Amino acid sequence: MNTETQQKPQKAQKKKSSPLVTAICILVIVCNLVYIFFSQQIHDFVGGRFYQPTSEMEGIIENVGFTWRSDYIMRSTKPELEQADIFNDHCVDDEDVNSALGCYSSADNRIYIYDVKGKELDGVKEAVLMHEVLHAIYDRLSDGRKEALNSDLKNYYEDHKDVFGDYMDAYSEEQYYTELHSIIGQRVYDNDLSDSLKNHYAKYFKNHDATVEFYKKYTAVLNAEEEKIEKAKDALDAMHGILENKRNTYRSNLDSYNKQVDYHNRQTELGNWSQSRYDYLVAQGKRIDEERDALNAYIDEYNVEVEKYNALLEEERQLFGKLDSRFETTTEKTESDNKT
């Protein structure tokens, strides 16, 4: 008798995922989230690692004293010192009446600094680097952080308009707050800042006051030059006033003397000779000659001071020209034209 053995159906077994695969999936998700939320920081960190500054630029960076927060941002912008012609291509707008010392391009995340020459302007490159890095920092802030910061910046500016004058009038609404963020950070000591602004800048500079000192140092040289010009101009104006008084007095005395001579000559022709009148006119003529000589000597003295003043103006022109990349290229072209 044949019998059939009935087998029970087998249940399908669920495949268990490997712990390694699970870990990899989680890691991929985490990496994606990290990149989404920190892509700018990652980009800055990676980009900055390949930056190789010149020895001069490295010294400038060290002098400024960036904190770790700002250092990797700064290095990601690859700051570069440039000669006038190259710098003008990167940073100078032909329609802009103001000179530029540096610029930050958010489009390609680069900072360019004009290679200012002259030991008397020590500190200018540090001040410019600080200013431009502050632009890069502001560019990376969230909208919420910018809104709070803008309020603090605006309050400070409104309370200190006399310090800044009409500086901010040249900036569009789009550029306004990033520029305000840079100039306040570049120019204002901590004890003049609100606590919130002081804490903000402290995140990016190891010693904010020491960094501000670079701006104060080179602008003090410019201010001293302007004060010297102003004092020389005041002295020259005073001399000019004295000269005009002397000249008017001499002309009046000369006119009076000539009239007396004419009168004496007419009287002599009429037979009314007077020895006393003649002696008086001779003495008066000597005084007129002495007055003329004194006037001419004062004119010579005045002209010497005019030459000194003009030399100061040229000195000022050359000094401020060192801060204008267009001045250098114009000077070079003029010198070249003179040689042909």
Predicted regions and their residues:
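N-terminal Lys/Arg-rich, disordered targeting/topogenic segments
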Residues: 1-17
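C-terminal amphipathic alpha-helix
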Residues: 284-340
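Extended alpha-helical coiled-coil "stalk/arm" regions
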Residues: 243-280
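Eukaryotic low-complexity, mixed-charge intrinsically disordered interaction/regulatory segments enriched
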Residues: 117-121, 134, 153
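Active-site recognition of the HExxH zinc-binding catalytic motif
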Residues: 127-140
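Metalloprotease/metallohydrolase-associated module, dominated by Zn2+-dependent proteases
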Residues: 2, 22, 26, 30-38, ...
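Short pre-active-site segment immediately N-terminal to the catalytic Zn-binding motif
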Residues: 111-129
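Short, charged, amphipathic alpha-helical segments
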Residues: 151, 279-285
